[in-house]
Amino acid sequence: MSVQEYLDKHMLSRKIEDAVNAAVRAKTSDPVLFIANHLKKAVSSVITKVKARQILDSRGIPTVEVDLHTNKGVFRASVPSGDSSGTYEAIELRDGDKGMYLGNSVAKAVKNINEKISEALIGMDPKLQGQIDQAMIDLDKTEKKSELGANAILAVSIAACKAGAAEKEVPLCKHLSDLSGRANMVLPVPAFTVLSGGKHASNTFAIQEIMILPIGASRFEEALQWGSETYHHLKAVISEKNGGLGCNVGEDGGLAPDISSLKEGLELVKEAINRTGYNDKIKIAIDIAATNFCLGTKYDLDIKSPNKSGQNFKSAEDMIDMYKEICNDYPIVSIEDPFDKEDWEHTKYFSSLGICQVVGDDLLMSNSKRVERAIQESSCNALLLKVNQIGTVTEAIEVVKMARDAQWGVVTSHRCGETEDSFISDLSVGLATGVIKAGAPCRGERTMKYNQLLRIEEELGDQAVYAGEDWKLSL
């Protein structure tokens, strides 16, 4: 092929001439840089390579990380994992070889990306999120993504989403907003974990989390300040109570002292809030995670106590009485998983009382079929969104739409095994979920999410809207 034939085939002369003319019209001070950027924009970006690797999450357990290559650059994503997996959530693929990371290796998921998913996606337009996600679902051919692994599929889905935003030259949160069909973006109220228990901490506290929500702040930046100050006041309160001794932190960064009762924990948090001076502007939320201490039809609140007497078993009716009492005595606005994950009846009844927001996590598992059932039966009134329980960005957007159409609240959530990826921050803003639950204002994998929200608020400038008092339905 001659030089002229090569130029003609790729229309190089025309493209270069257009770039030069554009530089002249713009009267740019750096025409070479302008021309280079102009030519780069003229190239239709496609996925050219997908490379996965095994990394460690915040607990030292393997997870999947992906580098997705396009003509615009390399886009990285990594996925979190929980302390357990539910029956109705997408399958996290692990090797099961006890000789490798005690059976937790994700080498199979990594291989599936490098050999199968990569081949299927090369040449696709990263802006077409729905098509990319559907291509992986079709390749997997199972209802719960057990063939390729939801951890493999989600890592690629998130990386593609980041690449799509870059191709459009918009922030990731804006790209997600566009994908969801929303006209507005909203900075969420952070639900900071301040006390940890349950499966997330090595203490005697059966309840999984007590959180604070700075709904009275005017901006996310102020909310973050209040959360940090309350957290450190709480640390001081616990130290004083323990005679100057500190305490451990849980997997999500929350403080984890030995606590004998839910009321004791709430009193500690109440005192910390009082010390900040933001009393009426900071509310409390609780993740009961009742499934973890449900034995048959009873709830054992002493399940983690070394000196358990067996006298602290509660029926579902007893639990409802307890919730009524604490919601009357403390500024509690939201309770997550107040009953066992299969106890639809009592969850529905408690929700009907209208005492506070009732969030479904273990009850729903971000599963569209269970969300649909809960909507039809009025079982709860808020969704805890865990993207890794679904497996793709597109499906996450769809389940949020279901919740919003039902006038539910939505809480975007982290997992106990987190990574340095801050995708859920952009997701929460783009989908205007109203609340984000990303752990304590402590530990890098948690603060990474909150710090990203600071950057988003700064980037949005005068257009930034903080959910604040409208945290339930950020419309």
From Swiss-Prot:
Pathway membership, UniProt: Carbohydrate degradation; glycolysis; pyruvate from D-glyceraldehyde 3-phosphate: step 4/5
Entry EC number(s): 4.2.1.11
Single GO molecular function: phosphopyruvate hydratase activity
Cofactor entry: Mg(2+)
Description of how the protein assembles with itself and partners: Homodimer.
Cited NCBIfam families: eno
Name of the protein in question: Cytosolic enolase 3
